[in-house]
Amino acid sequence: MSRYSAIIPNDVVNGDGVCVSFFVQGCPHHCPGCFNEETWDFHGGELYGPDVKWTIIKAISANNITRNFSVLGGEPLAPQNLDMTWEVIDAVRHAYPNITITLWTGYTYSMLMANPNETLLNILNTIDILVDGPFIESEKDLSLKLRGSRNQHIRVRRDNQWEIQDD
């Protein structure tokens, strides 16, 4: 069963504008210098259940303010987390078709596309922004938008095509 680390209902750091951020638990990358090392252990955090997605859906429109949605980790696209990540993203997109959904992954886009399964393709066809690539400490640059190191890319989905928009 998948696990998650945290839900932050009013996050202004991770994403576009005010977001609800969902941190999945478990990461195979173990990037040196990672800001979120406590999310590496696949057995840590909290057990995911269907009530979690409803908590997120309610938080997105709490106090009549619609927020965007961010999915971070841990590694949302790790095989152990893929079904949970899709379940949450699918529910959020159906409830809020016009919000921006951003997902961070330590996998590069080319790694993801080398052998994608249906669940991964569903996720990539539903989110709006993909921040891809592992954090590399020697490439660290805290002035970058949405990224921690220069090797990472911001990809925006437009007309079912991904465009790099690193600036």
Name each model-derived stretch:
Residues 1-18:
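Short, charged low-complexity linear segments at domain edges
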Residues 36-51, 65-79, 98-113, 124, ...:
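Core AdoMet radical
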Residues 80-93, 140-167:
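P-loop/Walker A phosphate-binding loop and immediately adjacent motor/lid segment at beta-alpha junctions
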Residues 88-95, 122-126:
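Catalytic-core regions built around general acid/base machinery
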Residues 62-63, 95:
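Alpha-helix C-cap/termination motif
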Residues 53-62:
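A short, well-ordered alpha-helical element
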Residues 15-51:
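Canonical Radical SAM [4Fe-4S] cluster-binding loop centered on the CxxxCxxC motif
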Residues 49-54, 82-89, 115-121:
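Charged helix-capping and loop-helix junction motifs
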